[in-house]
Amino acid sequence: MIGWSAVSRSLRLTASIASVSLLFAGIGCAPRAGSLSGAVTPARFPVTDIPRGHQRIVFRWEYVDQALAAKGEGIARVASPDSVRLDFYLDGGLGGGYAIVVGDSISTPGGDQVRRYLPPVALLWAVMGRLAVPATPDTVAKVDGDVLRADIGRNPVWRVTFVADHLTRLERIVSGRRLEWVSRTGSDVRYQNERSSRSLTLKITSTDEAPPFDPEIWRR
């Protein structure tokens, strides 16, 4: 007779195999990243630190995936050197949510159920124009006119693009395929997850200096 422990182990193994299969299926659907273009150059990146002080950024947002579509207004409260609170309000007063990013950590009121809709921390910081990927000995940079591109790390590779000293794109590449990315063009910011067809777009409407924020906004 097979005991419950054996059944449990079997179920866990089956679930693990299914998860790995889905992961590789998702990676296979993502487009190939290709190689860097341009001439090899020293990997010296422009400064992307958050400006000293506090900022209040107002934006319109829209979220779309295979099962859900939502849009509304949003506010980002940014504090130097590495803190931001993002509040999202649904159109029609139907509710909302928030995410707090401090350094390399994210907290949300809904835990993992909400966090799965958000980009990884490095890509969230790219939304704000900040490069938060540590440089490694594997970094390769190339320049083409006023465009600087670099691959940082190994599997995953973070591919960053600067145009005239501004961070305009950050991609996460796994096994040679571009799984997700953030692009910044003027006041438009877009996050795209290629595996799940998930996207979050922001249209920035205003950016203003602000007085110090209430410390309570950084707590859950």
Feature map (PLM): residue ranges:
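N-terminal beta-strand/beta-hairpin edge segment
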Residues: 60-65, 70-106
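Sec-dependent bacterial lipoprotein signal peptides
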Residues: 1-29
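Residue-level recognition of conserved beta-strand positions in structured domain cores
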Residues: 88-90, 110, 172, 193
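Short, surface-exposed beta-strand-loop junctions and turns on beta-sheet-rich folds
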Residues: 91-95, 113-116, 155-158, 176
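A short, polar/proline- and glycine-enriched secondary-structure boundary/capping micro-motif
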Residues: 95-103, 118-121, 179-182, 200-203
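Acidic/charged, solvent-exposed loop-and-adjacent secondary-structure segments enriched in E/D, K/R, S/T
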Residues: 106-137
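N-terminal leader/targeting segments and the immediate start of mature chains
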Residues: 28-80, 111, 118, 211-220
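Gly/Pro-enriched, hydrophobic low-complexity segments
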Residues: 141-220
